């Protein structure tokens, strides 16, 4: 042990006491590590290829659903087959059909927002994968 050398005895033993002791009571002179890298690495749940695939698919989904939402909002006649109407909706004129068109367009915009959130999650996974490459183990 280092404190058994001849000469004046130090007031406390060296910092190599035990792992359990040093883990619970870190030395005030020891450099502190930020818990951020471990916490950020624990959020990593997709590999780099899956995250890139998620970005591509979500970008395509956002573009397609926004365009569909716009076309439903302007009451495109080509999309009449995709509007969920019944025979009762035709009785009171076209206003009921227009309301159904607008409801489907809102649904498309909501789905585009969900795809945008998925793209943001995939982008975060790509960033975490890149950060993981630079981490030292």
Swiss-Prot record:
Q: Name one GO biological process term.
A: proton transmembrane transport
According to its UniProt record, this protein's enzyme class is hydrolase
Q: Which GO terms describe its molecular function?
A: RNA endonuclease activity
Topology in the membrane? Multi-pass membrane protein
Pfam families, alphabetically?
V-ATPase_su_f
Give the residue spans that cross the bilayer. Answer: 52-72, 104-124
E.C. designation(s): 3.1.-.-
GO cellular component terms, semicolon-separated: clathrin-coated vesicle membrane; endosome membrane; Golgi membrane; lysosomal membrane; membrane; plasma membrane; proton-transporting V-type ATPase complex; vacuolar proton-transporting V-type ATPase, V0 domain
Report if keyword Manganese is assigned: no
Source domain of life: Eukaryota
Q: Which family does it belong to?
A: Belongs to the RNase K family.
- Subunit structure of this chain's protein: Interacts with the proton translocation complex V0 of the V-ATPase. Interacts with ATP6AP1.
> Which InterPro entries does UniProt cross-reference here?
Ribonucl_Kappa, RNase_K
Q: Is Repeat set as a keyword in this record?
A: no
| PANTHER family linked | RIBONUCLEASE KAPPA (PTHR31733)
> Where is this gene product found?
Endomembrane system; Cytoplasmic vesicle, Clathrin-coated vesicle membrane
Role summary: Endoribonuclease which preferentially cleaves ApU and ApG phosphodiester bonds. Hydrolyzes UpU bonds at a lower rate. Regulates the activity of vacuolar (H+)-ATPase (V-ATPase) which is responsible for acidifying and maintaining the pH of intracellular compartments. Required at an early stage of receptor-mediated endocytosis.
Give the keywords, sorted: Cytoplasmic vesicle, Endocytosis, Endonuclease, Hydrogen ion transport, Hydrolase, Ion transport, Membrane, Nuclease, Transmembrane, Transmembrane helix, Transport
Task: Identify the tissues in which this protein is expressed.
Answer: Widely expressed.
Q: In its UniProt entry, what is this protein called?
A: Ribonuclease kappa
């Amino acid at each position: 042990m280092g404190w058994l050398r001849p000469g004046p005895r130090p007031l406390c033993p060296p910092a190599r006491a035990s792992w359990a002791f040093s883990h619970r009571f870190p030395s005030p002179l020891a450099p502190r590590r930020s818990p951020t890298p471990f916490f950020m690495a624990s959020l990593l749940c997709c590999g780099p290829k899956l995250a890139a695939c998620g970005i591509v698919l979500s970008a395509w989904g956002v573009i397609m659903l926004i365009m569909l939402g716009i076309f439903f909002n302007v009451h495109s006649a080509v999309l009449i087959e995709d509007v969920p109407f019944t025979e009762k909706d035709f009785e009171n004129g076209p206003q009921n059909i227009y309301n159904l068109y607008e409801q489907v367009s809102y649904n498309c915009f909501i789905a585009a927002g969900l795809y945008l959130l998925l793209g943001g999650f995939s982008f975060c996974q790509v960033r975490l994968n890149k950060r993981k490459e630079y981490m030292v183990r």
